[in-house]
Amino acid sequence: MTNQRTTRDGSHGTESVPTQRSRESTDEDHGCPECNGDLVTDEDRGETTCGECGLVVEEDGIDHGPEWRAFNAQEQDEKSRVGAPTTNMMHDKGLSTNIGWQDKDAYGNTLSGRQRRKMQRLRKWNERFRTRNSKERNLKQALGEIERMASAFGLPDSVRETASVIYRRALGEDLLPGRSIEGVATSALYAAARQANTPRSLDEVASVSRVDRGEIARTYRYVARELSLEVAPTDPASYVPRFCSDLELSGDVERRARDLLAAAADAGITSGKSPVGLAAASVYAAALLTNERVTQNEVSTVANVSEVTIRNRYHEILDAGGEPGVEA
Amino acid sequence: MTDPKETINIENVVASTGIGQELDLQSVAMDLEGADYDPEQFPGLVYRTQDPKSAALIFRSGKIVCTGAKSTDDVHESLRIVFDKLRELSIKVEDDPEIVVQNIVTSADLGRQLNLNAIAIGLGLENIEYEPEQFPGLVYRLDDPEVVALLFGSGKLVITGGKEPKDAEHAVDKITSRLEELGLLD
């Protein structure tokens, strides 16, 4: 009885995990409501306080972790209040049953030949039952595709989840007819990555997708308009850390590049310019200013923009940043 | 400060008409001097007029599209030339076939740099399309007049989709007043 109650509480807890997570991150974004200081979470006390003024922003926080301590794998399973979370990344939200492939019973003994054949038949029908109609088969393929591309980019689960939700909405609103599953899946991922401020450029996306850049761009515009995703224009600065680390440049360069981009935006020379090109040029310019050698060729390879673009932009960026007269 | 409306310049006018009978383009192409007809490239016959400068696309169905003219008058003028040419080939064309203007493309200049990022947010992301990765202009679709405006960082803009020259003026008026409201035109 008690056990059942805790189980229910537990599953409730899982559902609220994503919202909880997103709220925490917005807390961090906004900071303390009084003084805008950084928030500190004390997990022992379950309190969130402001590191500057000491204001308690949240108390009696909920611990979403499993019950008590567990000392071995068996106890961990017993004391866990939660099952696997539901996820939009699987076509059935991870709610279906899978029949294991091992042909062993609960004790680990090998099944008899008769049972083995039975499990084989059950497995076949389970698989057929899991994807009953074309919509589910469609979802299965698309979500698999999203998963594959997100892995290639090393995008976190939150982005994959968002991409999956965007795809589900597109499917629900009948945007698929006339467009390819791969195209819509790719643009869902592209949109999700941009919304999470970890944008991947269209060229990068096209390099792992099964459809070409033109189709991705077209489908993305269509999906974004129909679902009113309202994705803000990409901030060039969000590419900077990735380019810097790919080029093995120091944090100094990264900071300098951000400053240059901010100055360029203030000077109003970024309107209508490709964010990827701006980011690449600012990284190149910042590396020059901090005497770390990179060639335009290296930057252009990493950023997937042409050297000409970098050359054209970095002069403008240096001028706007008040650093004229620096030459390569 | 000059009024942006004074910088309005019509760049292209597209109009359609028809002569109400099917044509054998192959023989028309033979007889009509200066006509380009390559059915593998394009199913229509292209006939270019020099004064006013424009191109008329003549289709097998007898429908004619005239494009490239710089004003509505020019469209009528060049279509009149085309009709006369066809009459010379003893193709029957009634006196005044109806000419419908389909699209007018206009350019204008707001006279100062625009911060497209701020405009994108200000006009509302649901009303505009701004993808600097794909196209440097900001696409703004107006409901009244029903035109599409492309705004560029240089302050220049292109207005397309209008059916009459007045549409462009209204659009420029609307855009300037919207941007002034938002304080984005200093």
Curated annotation (Swiss-Prot), chain A:
Residues 1-12, 21-32 have a biased composition (Basic and acidic residues). The keyword Transcription applies. It comes from the Archaea. Sequence repeats lie at residues 144-227, 238-319. GO terms for molecular function: DNA-binding transcription factor activity; TBP-class protein binding; zinc ion binding. Belongs to the TFIIB family. This is Transcription initiation factor IIB 4. It comes from Halobacterium salinarum (strain ATCC 700922 / JCM 11081 / NRC-1).
From Swiss-Prot, chain B:
Signal peptide: none annotated. SUPFAM superfamilies: TATA-box binding protein-like (SSF55945). GO terms for molecular function: DNA binding; DNA-binding transcription factor activity; general transcription initiation factor activity. InterPro entries: TBP, TBP_archaea, TBP_dom_sf. GO terms for biological process: DNA-templated transcription initiation. Disulfide bonds: none annotated. Keywords: DNA-binding, Repeat, Transcription, Transcription regulation. Gene3D superfamilies: TATA-Binding Protein (3.30.310.10). Transmembrane segments: none annotated. Sequence repeats lie at residues 10-86, 101-179. Belongs to the TBP family. NCBIfam families: PRK00394.1-2, PRK00394.1-5, PRK00394.2-2. General factor that plays a role in the activation of archaeal genes transcribed by RNA polymerase. Binds specifically to the TATA box promoter element which lies close to the position of transcription initiation. This is TATA-box-binding protein E. It comes from Halobacterium salinarum (strain ATCC 700922 / JCM 11081 / NRC-1). The gene is tbpE.
